[in-house]
Curated annotation (Swiss-Prot):
GO CC, any one term: plasma membrane
Protein species of origin: Gluconacetobacter diazotrophicus (strain ATCC 49037 / DSM 5601 / CCUG 37298 / CIP 103539 / LMG 7603 / PAl5)
Broad EC category: transferase
Involved pathway(s): Protein modification; lipoprotein biosynthesis (diacylglyceryl transfer)
Recorded topology in the membrane: Multi-pass membrane protein
Record's protein name: Phosphatidylglycerol--prolipoprotein diacylglyceryl transferase
Length: 280
């Protein structure tokens, strides 16, 4: 029998600077937003141009608010509504954790809708470019989850070479499901999105990339949920499903619908007048 790996006890705090504390999870968010901002700046310049660089810069604030507020509200509503209804002020205690990707996704969708309406942009065209970089942020977030020793997997056979004992989860070896998600929802999905986004014919069909992301994430998350331990306060749902899988069903349906609609509509080669790559 192979020796079982023991989860290394990482310090959840990345660095102390006087009274300032920067945690790995916060750094994952910051890195994802900043790198994503630079990549979206590049993507919107590809023909047909979807926005100006200045508009992408402005959207960074909207995206940050959408992710943080949506992620927090989603966690409260989807996972622990009774707890926060009884203790509403606990919703402000974000340092205790509790963020939902599905809530964050809804928050960003609202931010995209308001921002594109206010700036006279194509909602689907701009959303296509933004969703390409989202998996990168997901991957970084799951790595931060692993460093924090949270969201571990279900029990795994000790013969599995990468089975790992998480001290907070008991003595059983488990799947490091955070790393599965970082790989599938992060690296693999980002690679697929980036490759497809490079095709001009796809960029001329607004909504296809956004639909591909929704469907791709739903599939990747549903697979990873088969190895992830359900939240203790929810457990398994009917037919052995999890809350994460249930929330992925409407995402998958919406994704297929967007892709089908994009392919049935005539290609739209111009979303806004072409601008030089260095134009604001």
């Amino acid at each position: 029998m192979l020796p079982v790996l023991i989860f290394p006890q990482f310090d959840p705090v990345m660095v102390h600077v006087g009274p300032l504390v920067i945690r790995w999870y916060a750094m994952a968010y910051i890195t994802a937003l900043l790198v994503g901002w630079r990549l979206v700046r590049h993507l919107v310049r590809l023909a047909p141009r979807a926005a100006t660089d200045v508009q992408v810069d402005d959207f960074l604030t909207w995206a940050t608010l959408g992710v943080v507020l949506g992620g927090r509200l989603g966690y409260i509503l989807f996972y622990q509504p009774a707890v926060y209804l009884a203790h509403p002020l606990a919703a402000l205690q974000v340092w205790h954790g509790g963020m939902s990707f599905h809530g964050g996704a809804l928050g960003v969708i609202v931010a995209l809708a308001l921002f594109t309406w206010r700036n006279g942009l194509s909602f689907l065209g701009f959303s296509d470019r933004v969703t390409v970089v989202v998996p990168m942020g997901l991957g970084l977030g799951r790595i931060a989850n692993f460093i924090n020793g949270e969201l571990w997997g279900r029990p795994a056979p000790a013969s599995l070479p990468w089975a790992m004992v998480f001290p907070q989860a008991g003595p059983e070896p488990r799947h490091p499901s955070e790393l599965y998600e970082a790989l599938l929802e992060g690296l693999v999905l980002f690679s697929v999105m980036w490759i497809v986004a490079r095709r001009p014919a796809i960029r001329e069909r607004p909504g296809f990339l956004a639909g591909l992301f929704l469907f791709g994430y739903a599939v990747a998350r549903s697979i990873c949920e088969c190895f992830r331990e359900p939240d203790a306060f929810i457990g398994f749902l009917p037919f052995g499903t999890t809350m994460g899988q249930i929330l992925c069903i409407p995402m998958a349906i919406a994704g297929v619908g967007l892709m089908a609609q994009a392919m049935m509509r005539p290609a739209r080669p111009v979303l806004m007048p072409a601008l030089p790559a260095d134009s604001p």
